[in-house]
Amino acid sequence: MEYFAKRIIPCLDVKDGRVVKGVNFVGLRDAGDPVEAAIRYNEEGADELTFLDITASHEGRKPIVDIVKEVAKEVFIPLTVGGGISELSDIYDLLNVGCDKVSINSAAVKNPDFINKSSKRFGSQCIVVAIDVKKIAPNKWHVFIKGGREDTGLDAIEWAKEVVDRGAGEILLTSMDTDGTKAGFDIEITEIISKLVHVPVIASGGAGKMEHFKEVFEHSADAALAASIFHFKEIDIMDLKQYLHKNNISVRIN
């Protein structure tokens, strides 16, 4: 299902308190301070920010509430936070320091009822389920967890339907096949899932140039997330929005 204005969402992947960006989830490189990056995106016209502690679930750590608190003090656009969220108290702590939505991934796979409980407790509008997918055969994608380290064996399309049925208000869909490549979003799986579910789908993984955003929006994505092209200033967010506007894609321009 498509929603009116398409959203541009920079992603802050954080490891050890620093923004990093790798290729296909490995080969990480330092991209700066998360608070400074958040301030810059807020000023540049990002619609939202997504902030992911990419090692929290793998290492069994809790969300980095302190960093989130500092970021939330400085930005005035919706902030989604993920990484290490496995209990209702984790969600409460994050919402309490100023984040607007939480993103759950590994915990949702291991305990699907957690989606129901968190949605019922806090409202579906603030529960995002992140789904990392990889194509394993023609027309077949599996769900991966732990930063792409573990194949769950779950069918990605069926899992997307299930998380929405359980109360997810949004899906953050990352293609591991395109992530970090700058060769374009994974149009095929993004379009399939976007047309299948009745909640917004955020496309993630593969953005390299402005045309990629236009393409994924024309194929039903409601929002597009990217990291390195924004972190390293390869694409300016306002320039991107002007480009999309000229190409008849509805975006918010401040």
Curated annotation (Swiss-Prot):
Briefly, what is this protein's role? IGPS catalyzes the conversion of PRFAR and glutamine to IGP, AICAR and glutamate. The HisF subunit catalyzes the cyclization activity that produces IGP and AICAR from PRFAR using the ammonia provided by the HisH subunit.
What family does this belong to? Belongs to the HisA/HisF family.
One GO MF term on file is:
imidazoleglycerol-phosphate synthase activity
- The Enzyme Commission number assigned here is 4.3.2.10
The record's SUPFAM superfamilies line, in alphabetical order, gives: Ribulose-phoshate binding barrel (SSF51366)
Q: What class of enzyme is it?
A: lyase
Q: Which GO terms describe its cellular component?
A: cytoplasm
* Top-level taxon in the UniProt lineage: Bacteria
Q: What is its main location?
A: cytoplasm
Q: What is this protein called?
A: Imidazole glycerol phosphate synthase subunit HisF
Known NCBIfam families for this protein? hisF
Instruction: Describe the reaction catalysed, as an equation.
Output: 5-[(5-phospho-1-deoxy-D-ribulos-1-ylimino)methylamino]-1-(5-phospho-beta-D-ribosyl)imidazole-4-carboxamide + L-glutamine = D-erythro-1-(imidazol-4-yl)glycerol 3-phosphate + 5-amino-1-(5-phospho-beta-D-ribosyl)imidazole-4-carboxamide + L-glutamate + H(+)
A Gene Ontology biological process in which this protein takes part is: L-histidine biosynthetic process
